[in-house]
């Protein structure tokens, strides 16, 4: 039976060789055409993700005004978080579930300033967070961010994060302390969701040094913003890199996520060269002003969207009994088009800072930067 199936498949493919010869219209790949189509696709994609029917009109007077420091801080923090969380190409997510299509609005909430803070508490105004987010939003991601500026010498140590519950605290997770000035991030998505279901006006975290031998070990880290330094002005307080949470959320009606099918895939993070004909990632920089004619996006000025190109000459796995037939078909019909590589595997998000009329906004656009491609 196995031999008969193999012969039947072989006959079908060899028959297709003669048929495809008459229909073959292979032509050199027009990279400029692909770029133009990719740019136009991105134009529509960004507007769609932001739920805009057309590009916003630029308010020249508003554009020339000073941008609020708070929004610049939100944008910069989002960029830093994305850089830290970017998946290395050599460790792609296997069988990923697609992120929500629509843009996620980003909000930044800093801790309550305290004159003294010996127990290293991080208090947040939950009432303010709830009112800012509103009721009809889905919280997608929440990250607690701390800047470590002074670190202990000697052996490697850990910083532990606890959730404050009344007079007690519950352990959440820990991070190894870097030996350099660096931001630390903790995923506190579920914690904030729980807080928003309660009635308390304030909720908080506590930081502790991990030490099994000495639980009361002195806190040796310096984290700016844990206490209010005497003499701080309002401007300095705003610009101080205080501990904060970044909340990414989207409206209830924008949660149109779909799960990807599980299947075997061949993936590549290979960057295309002039001689590349196999599946690869081709670099494409989009300048918002030059390529799209947009002045309403303040930051960034552009980004590397990239795209997948090339062909997948061998897409069946060695486990498939018909792989020999495919190889034989390619041998007899070398001019036939191989399966195109047009499917991104790993895509990174893009935060943008833009104007809508007289309003400034910071939002995160999911799946905008192609990092790796796959043959499927």
Swiss-Prot record:
<dbReference type="Pfam" id="PF00688">
    <property type="entry name" value="TGFb_propeptide"/>
</dbReference>
<dbReference type="GO" id="GO:0005615">
    <property type="term" value="C:extracellular space"/>
</dbReference>
<feature type="short sequence motif" description="Cell attachment site">
    <location>
        <begin position="230"/>
        <end position="232"/>
    </location>
</feature>
<dbReference type="InterPro" id="IPR003939">
    <property type="entry name" value="TGFb1"/>
</dbReference>
<comment type="subunit">
    <text>Latency-associated peptide: Homodimer; disulfide-linked. Latency-associated peptide: Interacts with Transforming growth factor beta-1 (TGF-beta-1) chain; interaction is non-covalent and maintains (TGF-beta-1) in a latent state; each Latency-associated peptide (LAP) monomer interacts with TGF-beta-1 in the other monomer. Transforming growth factor beta-1: Homodimer; disulfide-linked. Transforming growth factor beta-1: Interacts with TGF-beta receptors (tgfbr1 and tgfbr2), leading to signal transduction. Interacts with EFEMP2.</text>
</comment>
<protein>
    <recommendedName>
        <fullName>Transforming growth factor beta-1 proprotein</fullName>
    </recommendedName>
</protein>
<dbReference type="InterPro" id="IPR016319">
    <property type="entry name" value="TGF-beta"/>
</dbReference>
<dbReference type="GO" id="GO:0005125">
    <property type="term" value="F:cytokine activity"/>
</dbReference>
<feature type="region of interest" description="Bowtie tail">
    <location>
        <begin position="214"/>
        <end position="238"/>
    </location>
</feature>
<feature type="glycosylation site" description="N-linked (GlcNAc...) asparagine">
    <location>
        <position position="76"/>
    </location>
</feature>
<feature type="glycosylation site" description="N-linked (GlcNAc...) asparagine">
    <location>
        <position position="125"/>
    </location>
</feature>
<dbReference type="Pfam" id="PF00019">
    <property type="entry name" value="TGF_beta"/>
</dbReference>
<keyword id="KW-0165">Cleavage on pair of basic residues</keyword>
<feature type="disulfide bond">
    <location>
        <begin position="312"/>
        <end position="375"/>
    </location>
</feature>
<comment type="function">
    <text>Transforming growth factor beta-1: Multifunctional protein that regulates the growth and differentiation of various cell types and is involved in various processes, such as normal development, immune function, microglia function and responses to neurodegeneration. Activation into mature form follows different steps: following cleavage of the proprotein in the Golgi apparatus, Latency-associated peptide (LAP) and Transforming growth factor beta-1 (TGF-beta-1) chains remain non-covalently linked rendering TGF-beta-1 inactive during storage in extracellular matrix.</text>
</comment>
<dbReference type="GO" id="GO:0005160">
    <property type="term" value="F:transforming growth factor beta receptor binding"/>
</dbReference>
<feature type="disulfide bond">
    <location>
        <begin position="272"/>
        <end position="280"/>
    </location>
</feature>
<keyword id="KW-0732">Signal</keyword>
<feature type="region of interest" description="Arm domain">
    <location>
        <begin position="69"/>
        <end position="258"/>
    </location>
</feature>
<dbReference type="GO" id="GO:0042127">
    <property type="term" value="P:regulation of cell population proliferation"/>
</dbReference>
<dbReference type="InterPro" id="IPR015615">
    <property type="entry name" value="TGF-beta-rel"/>
</dbReference>
<keyword id="KW-1015">Disulfide bond</keyword>
<comment type="similarity">
    <text>Belongs to the TGF-beta family.</text>
</comment>
<dbReference type="InterPro" id="IPR001839">
    <property type="entry name" value="TGF-b_C"/>
</dbReference>
<keyword id="KW-0497">Mitogen</keyword>
<feature type="glycosylation site" description="N-linked (GlcNAc...) asparagine">
    <location>
        <position position="167"/>
    </location>
</feature>
<keyword id="KW-0964">Secreted</keyword>
<dbReference type="InterPro" id="IPR017948">
    <property type="entry name" value="TGFb_CS"/>
</dbReference>
<dbReference type="GO" id="GO:0051781">
    <property type="term" value="P:positive regulation of cell division"/>
</dbReference>
<dbReference type="GO" id="GO:0007179">
    <property type="term" value="P:transforming growth factor beta receptor signaling pathway"/>
</dbReference>
<dbReference type="InterPro" id="IPR029034">
    <property type="entry name" value="Cystine-knot_cytokine"/>
</dbReference>
<keyword id="KW-0339">Growth factor</keyword>
<keyword id="KW-0325">Glycoprotein</keyword>
<keyword id="KW-0272">Extracellular matrix</keyword>
<dbReference type="GO" id="GO:0008083">
    <property type="term" value="F:growth factor activity"/>
</dbReference>
<feature type="disulfide bond">
    <location>
        <begin position="308"/>
        <end position="373"/>
    </location>
</feature>
<feature type="signal peptide">
    <location>
        <begin position="1"/>
        <end position="22"/>
    </location>
</feature>
<dbReference type="GO" id="GO:0014008">
    <property type="term" value="P:positive regulation of microglia differentiation"/>
</dbReference>
<dbReference type="InterPro" id="IPR001111">
    <property type="entry name" value="TGF-b_propeptide"/>
</dbReference>
<feature type="region of interest" description="Straightjacket domain">
    <location>
        <begin position="23"/>
        <end position="68"/>
    </location>
</feature>
<comment type="function">
    <text>Transforming growth factor beta-1 proprotein: Precursor of the Latency-associated peptide (LAP) and Transforming growth factor beta-1 (TGF-beta-1) chains, which constitute the regulatory and active subunit of TGF-beta-1, respectively.</text>
</comment>
């Amino acid at each position: 039976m196995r031999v008969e199936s193999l012969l039947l498949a072989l006959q079908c493919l060899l028959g297709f060789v003669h048929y495809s010869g008459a229909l073959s219209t292979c032509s050199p790949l027009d990279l400029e055409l692909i770029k133009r189509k990719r740019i136009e696709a991105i134009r529509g994609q960004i507007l769609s993700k932001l739920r805009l029917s057309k590009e916003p009109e630029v308010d020249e007077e508003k554009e020339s005004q000073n941008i609020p420091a708070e929004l610049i801080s939100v944008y910069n923090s989002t960029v830093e978080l994305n850089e830290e969380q970017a998946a290395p190409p050599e460790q792609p997510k296997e069988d990923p579930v697609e992120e929500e299509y629509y843009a996620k609005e980003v909000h930044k909430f800093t801790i309550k300033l305290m004159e003294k803070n010996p127990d290293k508490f991080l208090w947040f105004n939950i009432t303010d967070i709830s009112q800012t987010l509103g009721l009809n939003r889905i919280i997608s991601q929440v990250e607690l961010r701390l800047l470590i500026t002074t670190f202990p010498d000697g052996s490697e140590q850990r910083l532990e994060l606890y959730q404050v519950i009344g007079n007690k605290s519950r352990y959440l997770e820990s991070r190894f302390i870097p030996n350099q000035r660096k931001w630390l991030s903790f995923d506190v998505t579920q914690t904030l969701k729980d807080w928003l279901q309660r009635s308390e006006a304030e909720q908080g975290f506590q930081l502790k040094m991990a030490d099994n031998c000495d639980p009361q070990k002195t806190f040796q880290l310096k984290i700016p913003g844990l206490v209010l330094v005497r003499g701080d002005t309002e401007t300095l307080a705003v610009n101080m890199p205080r501990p904060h949470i970044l909340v990414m959320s989207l409206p209830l009606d924008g949660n149109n996520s779909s799960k990807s099918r599980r299947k075997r895939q061949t993936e590549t993070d290979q960057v295309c060269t002039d001689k590349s004909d196999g599946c690869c990632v081709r670099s494409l920089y989009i300048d918002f002003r030059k390529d799209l004619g947009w002045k309403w996006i303040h930051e960034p000025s552009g980004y590397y969207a990239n795209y997948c190109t090339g062909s997948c000459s061998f897409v069946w796995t060695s486990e498939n009994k018909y792989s020999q037939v495919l190889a034989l078909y390619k041998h007899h019909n070398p001019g036939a088009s191989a399966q195109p590589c047009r499917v991104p595997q790993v895509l990174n998000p893009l935060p943008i800072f833009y104007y809508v009329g007289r309003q400034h906004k910071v939002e995160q656009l999911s799946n905008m930067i192609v990092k790796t491609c796959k043959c499927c």
